[in-house]
Amino acid sequence: MLFAVYMIDKLGMEAVRAQTGKAHAEYMATNEEGIRMGGPLYADDHKTMIGSVVIKDFSNRTDAENFIKNEPFNKAGLFETVMINPFKAFVDN
């Protein structure tokens, strides 16, 4: 089942994002199976990262919660908000 994981950064956490970026990339590479799409969210300036989104196939919501619980950005306290919702792809190129 697809879930969208939508994560918004706390304000003023740019240094944490930069310091944790390598661990985040390694975590995503290790857990890439089932990822349909993912990447950073940007402010309107198209330069400032303000969060992340991942659309991934999980067996259930608990697996999605465990995935984000162990994600390095989340463990470092980067996120102000984390939303996990079932997702249905109407268009899948």
Enumerate the language-model features and the residues they cover.
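Conserved, structured core segments of small domains
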Residues: M1-N93
